[in-house]
Amino acid sequence: MKSYLVLLKKILKEGSNRKDRTGIGTLSVFGYHMEFNLKLGFPLITTKKCHFPAIVHELLWFLKGDTNIKYLNDHNISIWNPWADERGYLGPIYGEQWRSWKTKDGRVIDQIDNVIHLIKNNPNSRRIVVSSWNVGDLHKMALLPCHVLFQFHVVDHVLHCQLYQRSCDVFLGLPFNIASYSLLTHMIAQQCNLKVGNFIWTGGDVHLYKNHIKQAKKQILRRPYLLPKLVINRKPTQIFNYLLQDFNLLNYKYHPSIHAKIAI
C-alpha cells in the first residue's frame, strides 16, 4: 500500500500545525482521496502489523448495533475503553446509527438492512447511503463519528464503496478504517451476489498527531509487501450473522509493529 506511505510523507512535508481537542496537536492536510481495487488484494497495510481479528470484531460489533464495550472486551479488544462510561456504554455511536436510527415521529430505521435491500432491488439507485452523523444525537455520543458517511454504487454486477471521513488519525486509525470498510464491502457483495470493485476513501481533516511523528518517519522507510487475499469461508443467511472464523486472510506478510499512544 504505497498510497498510504505517500499520504504519510505528504503530511510530514506539507501538514499545517493545528491545535486539537486532545491538546496534543497535529500536522494536518485538508481534503485527501485514495482508491483501492479490492480485486487486486485486501488493503491491510504491511509496513507494520495490523491486528486483523480486532478489525473484524469491531465491524461485527457495529453490525450488531451494539454500543457497549463488553463484546469487544470479551474478545480482548480495548480500543474503545477510554471513552466508555462506568457501565461500558458509549452512547448512540456507529452501531446504533447504522441499525437503529430513531426518527422524530417514532420510527426506527435499520440503514444496513435498507442498503442491502436497495442493492438487491434497485442497484442503480443513487441513495444507497449510510450516515452516522445524526445531529440530534451528537451530544449524547462519547466520541463523535469520524467516518461519517458511506455510499455504495453498483455497475455491471460489481459493488463499489466510497467513505467520507471528516477526521482521520492517519497513523493509528486509518489502517483500521480502510480495512474495515473494505471488509464490509466484501461482505455486502457476497450477500448480494456481486463482485467487489473499488473502495474509495475521502478524508476531511487528515492528520498525524505530534506524538506519532517519530513513528511515521520510521514507517515511511519500510518497503511494502504484496497485499494479502481475503477469503470468506461461508455465506451466512444475513449480514448480521458473520463470525470471526468466517474470514481468512491469506499471505499477510508484514513488518514489525510500531507502538504509538492513542490521543484521547
Swiss-Prot record:
Quaternary context: Homodimer.
Pathway terms, separated by semicolons: Pyrimidine metabolism; dTTP biosynthesis
Active-site positions on this chain: C146 (nucleophile)
Binding-site residues, dUMP: R21, R126, R127, R166, S167, C168, D169, N177, H207, L208, Y209
Positions annotated to bind (6R)-5,10-methylene-5,6,7,8-tetrahydrofolate: H51, D169, A263
One Gene Ontology cellular component: cytosol
Taxonomic path: Bacteria, Pseudomonadati, Pseudomonadota, Gammaproteobacteria, Enterobacterales
Alphabetical list of InterPro entries matching this protein: Thymidate_synth/dCMP_Mease (IPR045097), Thymidate_synth/dCMP_Mease_dom (IPR023451), Thymidate_synth/dCMP_Mease_sf (IPR036926), Thymidylate_synthase (IPR000398), Thymidylate_synthase_AS (IPR020940)
GO biological process, one term: methylation
Gene transcribed to yield this protein: thyA
Keyword Methyltransferase (UniProt): yes
Reactions this protein catalyses: dUMP + (6R)-5,10-methylene-5,6,7,8-tetrahydrofolate = 7,8-dihydrofolate + dTMP
Database matches in PROSITE patterns: THYMIDYLATE_SYNTHASE
Function description: Catalyzes the reductive methylation of 2'-deoxyuridine-5'-monophosphate (dUMP) to 2'-deoxythymidine-5'-monophosphate (dTMP) while utilizing 5,10-methylenetetrahydrofolate (mTHF) as the methyl donor and reductant in the reaction, yielding dihydrofolate (DHF) as a by-product. This enzymatic reaction provides an intracellular de novo source of dTMP, an essential precursor for DNA biosynthesis.
Superkingdom of this protein's organism: Bacteria
Family, similarity comment: Belongs to the thymidylate synthase family. Bacterial-type ThyA subfamily.
Location(s) in or outside the cell: Cytoplasm
Protein name per the record: Thymidylate synthase
Keywords on record: Cytoplasm, Methyltransferase, Nucleotide biosynthesis, Transferase
EC number in record: 2.1.1.45
A GO molecular function held by the record: thymidylate synthase activity
Keyword Transferase on entry: yes
